[in-house]
């Protein structure tokens, strides 16, 4: 009988010629049992997913707000942020459905730090097992605070470790056109937003929605880590996220109206989520405030074409580089620059006020 080491070292002719090594990863069940979702967390996820569904389908006039750090690199700071956000989530619960952005994986145009799961110690040691443990524990802690979480899905396996804690999910601009990500979205238990392409076009996102609404079969793993064929039911809670593109932003009223006309042609409710960051802010974090003002004017004017927003926010504004031997600034992003906490409070108040104004306009 082969030992575990021998099983890992099985060689096949002409295979793995560029693979340096293969390390086993913990099966999902190991972490699900170590960090099970509490009843409170499970109830929160269920309720928030239902609220997101109702907002997306026009049954709830509140605004879905996905807000938080560009990426998570310091669990302590992330939990600190979540505690602060909980206060504002409760304060604006009648106008906003606030969900914390808890992103552990970062898609890259070329290379760079790929996120807490991939490299949790920020030192190129790639301790994935530790990354998965840290991520699941943090999601448990955040949800236990009463703050629902949102994440971006980059592969077909990681969701088996963390998806039960996710109340909303995103497929990024670089992966919206990917068939496997559309298939994945069709089987996720939460609402999923598809970003428009990096070129600014929305056709790929519309196509992605259509694909994700259908049923699919694809390869993944079971909770016990065995390779398996997954059969999905299709996801009716998919939508478009406008994030701007190479040609500039697409959050203005005329841009939103143009996209909504395309959505309406497809037989869906003509509304979108607007990403305040990325190409909509020209990657200048402070411009998120300008985007917010414009979007709030649209909402306050009575527009129902914007049902949700996405904001990159942290405790300390801006961003920092990882420098060997230099202490990190607590609560500041190491990926995209974010607005700070003071501006976060302003943004959420403005969004809440805009929803109140929209209700008055529309009766």
Annotate each predicted stretch with a short phrase.
Residues 2, 9-16, 82, 95-251, ...:
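Active-site-facing alpha/beta catalytic cores
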Residues 17-56:
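N- or domain-start disorder-to-order transition segments that initiate the globular core
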Residues 64-77, 336:
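Conserved phosphate/anionic-ligand binding catalytic regions in large, soluble enzymes, centered on
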Residues 68, 274, 340:
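Conserved, mostly hydrophobic/aromatic
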Residues 86-87:
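N-terminal intrinsically disordered, cationic/polar leader segments
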Residues 243-245, 250, 258-273:
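A contiguous, surface-oriented mixed alpha/beta subdomain in the mid-to-C-terminal portion of proteins
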Residues 314-359:
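Internal helix-turn-beta structural module
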């Amino acid at each position: 009988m082969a030992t575990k080491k021998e099983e890992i070292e099985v060689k096949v002719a002409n295979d793995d010629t560029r693979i340096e090594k293969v390390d086993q990863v913990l099966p999902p069940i190991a972490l699900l049992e170590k960090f099970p979702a509490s009843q409170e967390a499970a109830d929160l996820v269920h309720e928030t997913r239902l609220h997101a569904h109702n907002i997306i389908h026009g049954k709830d006039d509140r605004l879905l707000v996905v807000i938080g750090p560009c990426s998570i690199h310091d669990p302590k700071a992330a939990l600190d942020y979540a505690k602060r956000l909980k206060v504002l989530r409760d304060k604006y619960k009648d106008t906003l459905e606030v969900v914390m952005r808890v992103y552990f994986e970062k898609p890259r145009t070329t290379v760079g730090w790929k996120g807490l799961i991939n490299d949790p110690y920020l030192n190129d040691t790639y301790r994935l097992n530790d990354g998965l443990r840290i991520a699941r524990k943090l999601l448990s802690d955040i949800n236990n605070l009463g703050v629902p979480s949102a994440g971006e899905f980059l592969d077909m396996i990681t969701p088996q470790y963390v998806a039960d804690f996710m109340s909303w999910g995103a497929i990024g601009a670089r992966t919206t056109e990917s068939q496997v990500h559309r298939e994945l979205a069709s089987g996720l238990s939460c609402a999923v937003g598809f970003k428009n392409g990096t070129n600014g076009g929305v056709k790929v996102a519309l196509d992605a929605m259509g694909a994700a609404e259908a049923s699919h079969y694809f390869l993944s793993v079971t909770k016990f880590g065995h390779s398996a064929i997954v059969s999905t039911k299709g996801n009716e809670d998919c939508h478009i996220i406008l994030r701007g593109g190479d040609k500039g932003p697409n959050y203005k009223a005329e841009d939103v109206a143009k996209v909504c006309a395309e959505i309406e042609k497809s037989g869906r409710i003509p509304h979108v989520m607007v990403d305040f960051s990325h190409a909509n802010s020209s990657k200048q974090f402070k411009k998120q405030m300008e985007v917010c003002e414009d979007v709030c004017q649209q909402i306050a004017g009575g527009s129902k074409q914007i049902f949700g927003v996405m904001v990159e926010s942290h405790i300390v504004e801006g961003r920092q580089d990882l420098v060997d031997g230099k202490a990190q600034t607590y609560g500041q992003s190491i990926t995209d620059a974010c607005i700070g906490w003071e501006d976060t409070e302003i943004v959420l108040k403005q969004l809440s006020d805009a929803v109140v104004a929209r209700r008055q306009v529309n009766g």
